[in-house]
Amino acid sequence: MQSPIHVTSEIGKLKTVMLHRPGKEIENVYPEILHRMLVDDIPYLPIAQEEHDLFAQTLRDNGAEVLYLEDLLTDALADDNIKDEFLEKIIAESGYAAGAIHDGLKEFLLSFSTKDMVNKIIAGVRKDEIKTKYASLAELAEDKDYPFYMDPMPNAYFTRDQQACIGDGITINHMTFKARQRESLFTEYIIKHNKRFADKGVEVWRNRYPEGRIEGGDELVLSDHVLAIGISQRTSAKAITELAESLFEKSDYDTVIAIHIPHNHAMMHLDTVFTMINYDQFTVHPAILRDGGHVDAYIMHPGNNGEISITHETNLKEILKKALDKPEIDLIPTGGGDPIIAPREQWNDGSNTLAIAPGVVVTYDRNYVSNDLLRKHGILVHEVRSSELSRGRGGPRCMSCPIVREDLKK
């Protein structure tokens, strides 16, 4: 049986991709909750939607089937029993496992069509939308001045992070911060109950319930047997070890390269500072490299008796040459390595490049120095508008979850 998921590289021609079109959740963010929502700014929704539609059309124009998260989840919840189970879980994960507010939320959400219910959950539910018959003192007094019973999900359009497709399987991720943890419940129900994926042999390499944090922006599929993963603000060494154990036991993957990056908001994931764009070419933010192009990387392989062998290496080019069996590696610095341009363009996702075929990428138009440099290195660059989407702190790779890519020619 052919798996509906197949991703054996970062650069194989993109055939199927999952997106989420930004919606009302963006307009349910206000300045006092920016930090709580893990965002730095509030995009202007009409323009953000226009930009996202143009991004999606760019992918279609280059041969990709575009699926939308909200549609996949709607189809997964077609059965009333499954929908009821999902509602119980999402309401519990919003802080209301039982009680008057739980009951009020459930009644309110069931008043919508399934598609509108999904969109409402993403948008968030305000307290003034719910009428409760009775609430305990704790329910009434807790966060009395906070306007939401269910928080909005303004990061949902970054579909890279809730999961990651690796080979013929997927990780359904335990995300780091509460603001995003509910998002991967969507993935769980899509994989279990959407007819496109359910009972089709999709391996779940790691589900969302172990405590170790992991996010898809840190998971880079370098080949059909090599995975790179960031040890970052959002992904822990514990989760990387568990994923490596699963891949080594159940798949053809025999190498996991764990790369330590600064643990900060600007470089929250590996793909904000390092992306693969061709067989032997990568973008890299100079701030992660020490003198001589060095990093702290831990190369993991299957060891004896089910254990993992780990070696510490530092020369990024040599690590990649060996892992990919290439005579040379071209590391292209964000912003040309300029001390002002590089951090500015990295902040605006100049390193967050989405490859849609070998040597063909989608980038934000605002990062013109990095884009021109990519062209000088022989890369075909499709620029997309980005004035509003970039306010969310994620680029084209962040906004896309590849489901199927063509295998690379050997």
From Swiss-Prot:
Enzyme class: hydrolase
Listed SUPFAM superfamilies: Pentein (SSF55909)
GO biological process, one term: arginine catabolic process to ornithine
Name of this protein: Arginine deiminase
Catalytic activities: L-arginine + H2O = L-citrulline + NH4(+)
Subcellular location: Cytoplasm
Highest taxon, organism lineage: Bacteria
Matching InterPro entries: Arg_deiminase (IPR003876)
Record: active site: 398
EC number: 3.5.3.6
Keyword Ligase recorded: no
GO molecular function, one term: arginine deiminase activity
Gene: arcA
Tagged with keyword Acyltransferase: no
One GO location term (cellular component): cytoplasm
Pathway involvement of the protein, from the record: Amino-acid degradation; L-arginine degradation via ADI pathway; carbamoyl phosphate from L-arginine: step 1/2
Keyword vocabulary terms for this entry: Arginine metabolism, Cytoplasm, Hydrolase
Stored HAMAP family: Arg_deiminase
Similarity remark: Belongs to the arginine deiminase family.
